[in-house]
């Protein structure tokens, strides 16, 4: 499931960076495959609860896996959002805004969170959570840059860069930043559930 979701996210980010509309449509069309896989694994978790009645560490593992599935499915939904923005927004107007650094950090956080889950690495869980502030800071700076560029270009170009002409693009670009930040939030959720699974520690939950 995580590999499928990461593939969708990678494709969405690449489409966004290169303004590849065909790739963006492929991401959107592929969401059904993610949803089907999610439902299959959700059913498996429910069956384990009902038939095996896990306790202690086994119970924490199944419960954490169930929650993590939901986070991964939501990341896939965010990838669809990013693909949709590729089809709708004019990135050329805000080419200076670096979304790649935000996307790279969010993806690394998600990768590390899943590695922590697979390897029972509590320290890595805490590292993922600690990087959330860095991601938030990148997102904040990007959002400020978008607004500043809008103001500066409107002042310089007058009617040629009227606010009403670019308001939709500004809104969508801010939504892109927000959704990338949410990918990081879901990575932190995965890390938190994993830490609880490993140590029965609700520190990050």
Placement of each model-derived feature along the sequence:
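Cytosolic, long alpha-helical scaffolding segments
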Residues: 1-205
């Amino acid at each position: 499931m995580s590999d499928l979701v990461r593939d969708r996210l990678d494709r969405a980010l690449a489409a966004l960076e290169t303004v590849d509309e065909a790739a963006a449509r492929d991401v959107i069309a592929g969401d059904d495959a993610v949803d089907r896989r999610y439902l299959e694994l959700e059913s498996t978790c429910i069956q384990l609860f009902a038939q095996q009645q896990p306790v202690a560490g086994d119970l924490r593992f199944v419960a954490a896996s169930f929650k993590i599935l939901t986070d991964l499915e939501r990341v896939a939904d965010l990838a669809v959002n990013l693909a949709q923005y590729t089809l709708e927004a004019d990135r050329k107007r805000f080419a200076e805004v670096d979304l790649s650094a935000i996307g790279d950090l969010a993806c690394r956080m998600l990768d590390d969170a899943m590695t922590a889950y697979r390897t029972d690495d509590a320290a890595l869980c805490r590292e993922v959570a600690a990087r959330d502030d860095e991601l938030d800071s990148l997102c904040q700076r990007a959002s400020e840059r978008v607004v500043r560029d809008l103001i500066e270009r409107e002042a310089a170009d007058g009617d040629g860069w009227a606010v009403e002409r670019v308001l939709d693009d500004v809104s969508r670009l801010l939504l892109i930043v927000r959704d990338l930040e949410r990918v990081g939030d879901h990575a932190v959720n995965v890390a938190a559930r994993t830490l609880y699974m490993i140590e029965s520690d609700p520190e990050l939950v």
